[in-house]
């Protein structure tokens, strides 16, 4: 039986995320979209109820073998049927119109990848200001060729994604920057303030603002200067 293609595949990596993934998938399920889309969870062999919750929300579940979020994204993309792949994380809550607004950016046939807006879930003033700065970085730096990507809200045209090899499942961190750098060589970048996801602050608060900022700044610089990104990124539950 032939696979039925869809317009968009929404791909969510997960590992032991039963506390969070329900809210994420519920928000995705509520999306109003002019086309057709599927939801895929790339699961890292979760030991809790993550897989059951995912299936209860109608997601297709595939297990990844690398023990990384990138592995989950890659495994999901391997079975995806969409023309556009949208990637988020299991602890996010996508906003209204998210799928449609991302899809609309790809109506320009020259666009091969895109990034949307991020906002903190239950954030304080410092976290909201930080998110504004990150959104400005994404909107301004990428068109200049200096790739900045937040893997919580990134999308790619399927044909370009596979032409560049897609996510590297072996990368523990900076897999989103790696993908963006590969896609940048193939076509145009787009950014939408309307395509918003609310992101968890659990890692920011666990690590502290300074440690979080210095870690990701260091990884960003490593990616752009040809050095290996960090291999350490412990789960925060």
Where are these regions (language model features)?
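Acidic donor-binding/catalytic loop of UDP-sugar-dependent glycosyltransferases
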Residues: 49, 88-105, 181
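N-proximal low-complexity "stem/linker" segments adjacent to membrane-targeting elements
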Residues: 1-27
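A conserved acidic beta->alpha catalytic loop
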Residues: 27, 43-51, 92
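Short aromatic/hydrophobic "clamp" motif used to bind/position activated sugar donors
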Residues: 85
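Conserved donor NDP-sugar-binding/catalytic core segment of glycosyltransferases
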Residues: 96-126
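Glycine-rich, basic loop-to-helix element that forms the pyrophosphate-binding segment
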Residues: 64-80
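Acidic donor-binding loop at a coil-to-helix junction in glycosyltransferase catalytic cores
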Residues: 173-179
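Short, acidic, metal-binding catalytic loop of nucleotide-sugar glycosyltransferases
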Residues: 26-36
